[in-house]
Amino acid sequence: METSLTTLVVKPGEADRLIAGHPWVYASSIQRSSQPPTDGELVQLKDHRQRFLGVGFFNSRSKIQVRMVSNERVEVNSAFFAERIRAALAVRKRHMPGATSFRVVSAEGDLLSGLIIDKYEDVVVLQISSLGMEQHKADIVKAIQEVLQPRSVYERNEIHSRQYEGLPPVSGLLAGEPVEMVDVTLNRSEEHTSELQ
């Protein structure tokens, strides 16, 4: 990963919360920055002793000014997302063997704040609620195609919370072939039809 990331220093007492795994950094938690960061930019967090705490996406328009993505120095690209999706998928397969429709990625629960990925048989639907994830949408779609190999990838981003990140509502096909309806099997015995258009 490049070492030229903008550095944000958090106030004394805030570091312990981040070290414990809390994924959000509020504006009131930030003491200073090495330079003014750009909205959507990947930044690094340090404590007042210059101890590295992790990296995350910055957005000045949100009360959550940084959404952490890792406590290590990483490069956020399609390979990064593929690795996280594989890890999340492994957990689901372990707890739901044989399931073909389920939530693959559950935002903070899978260390991907602002991203939800649902799998409906061979169709994948993603929902993005943060600017940083929105700017990496192409990387996310590429990772989804690599790991899940779906027939189609859709976005359903009409959620109200996007406005707090300065994002407009949007939905539609991102990759693959158009699909209007999907027959979904839940709990192996229950069938459900999901409308995508």
Regions found by a protein language model. Name each.
Residues 1-121, 178-181:
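Non-catalytic accessory regions of SAM-dependent methyltransferases
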Residues 42-43, 123-125, 151-153:
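Structural motif
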Residues 57, 129, 158:
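Surface loops and adjacent helix of pleckstrin homology
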Residues 107-118, 136-190, 194:
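Non-catalytic substrate-recognition/targeting regions of SAM-dependent transferases
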Residues 121-134:
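A short interface-forming secondary-structure element
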